[in-house]
Amino acid sequence: MALKELRIGTRASQLALWQANWVKSELEKRYPDMTVTLTKIKTIGDKILDVPLAQVGGKGLFVKEIEEAMLRGEIDIAVHSMKDVPTEFPEGLGLYCITEREDPRDAVISNNVKFADLPQGARIGTSALRRQAQLLKVRPDLEMVIIRGNVQTRMDKLKTEGLDAVILAAAGLNRLGFADQITELLPTDLSLPAIGQGALGIECNLSNQDVKDAISFFNHPDTSRAVRAERALLWRCEGGCQVPIAAFGEVTGDELKLTGFIASVDGKVSVKGVVTGPADDCEKLGVKLAEQLLSEGGHAILAEVYQREVSREKEIPV
């Protein structure tokens, strides 16, 4: 093991620090003589908290500044929530490891009221257009309230903003020790997860073989294939993290099942599909499903979503 030091770049949120510290701890266990340090970096997604992410626009809202630090040689690796990682990287950088997935489902936090039992016109807090579209599809009576901030802040808004429920990723709640706050886990056929939800990604300079050798043990092959399929679908749809596109890959043996979903923001128009095939062909399967969804109405849906996004971007000073 040639490396004596490894510098990790991370956002400063509670969840991001948990994730980065987990990577740090695993590295220290594996390489007791290595010095592992954390550098906290504020991203544009962290700085703009009073505007819904979909209105901020653009891609890489939670990674761009971290990648810039890597390009300047200030950090060696970056730890990301996979659902925040764009499908394209700056030249020389790339995703080298995808960790084993935590629970990929969405979780309901409420006053012990399950989703199906929420009252007519219930106010639901969420940060994702993907969730909003899918839940409105089955419950058009709901009022969606866009909430921002870290996990604890969003949970607190159940009371501070008079919400009936808050929808968050189960993975983050589990990692931070909030599993006991979950009222219900939504099945994936009701709320298909975000691309990469529940998995962590480790990005590095792809020319640094010592760093790649040091972190390679983090990669979980089945999760990697599933997430690569999901990301290929997103790439083919030219989608960012803040559009109503969802995908979920499941690997069983050598087979991959990929489910994808594209919807209008209000959930009134949507298209959903499934493909299966060899797990080693994960990215081809992702592109195949994307093209199927686009041809069945997804292209028109996304054109309208992106047009709305562009018009809103012009109104927001960043």
Swiss-Prot record:
Gene Ontology cellular-component annotations: cytoplasm
Cofactors: dipyrromethane
Residues where S-(dipyrrolylmethanemethyl)cysteine is found: C241
Top EC group: transferase
GO molecular function, one term: hydroxymethylbilane synthase activity
GO biological process entries: protoporphyrinogen IX biosynthetic process
Keyword Magnesium included in the entry's annotation: no
Enzyme Commission number(s) from the entry: 2.5.1.61
CDD domains: PBP2_EcHMBS_like
Protein name stated in the entry: Porphobilinogen deaminase
Organism: Geobacter sp. (strain M21)
